[in-house]
């Protein structure tokens, strides 16, 4: 359970882009199902692929798309809380380079996704749903792009739910 027993991977044109490692557990305080994220890994040399995927999702960042996919999975299986590892909580600190600089700053990303450090300082508590701006909040020049992006994200959510439901039968 160091990084996770399960993973969700994001591919574009048959090539892996991101992988998120996690495990399922029961919340110690209320017994509800939770997900603990142990790691989020991106590609070594995937800049062109990332650009392609970002374009395919109308400007939505691939790292955010990966986390959105996990949120869709969590909703489909009835998870009510998601906890994401902090930089300090990451067991191996493998994301620290030889020169001691972070390769990946988990904290910055989780905070960007509205995560808040919880009482167990090794984890952020993450919202299970992503905030979407209303069309009125967006510049008129960005509305069509966001409408297409949200439609694509809704397709992804439906596909994840259908895949999970097929295993429930």
What are these regions (language model features)?
Residues 64, 75-81, 122-128, 163-168:
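Noncatalytic linker/hinge segments flanking ATPase motor cores
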Residues 86-155, 159:
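Active-site/acyl-donor-binding loops of N-acyltransferases
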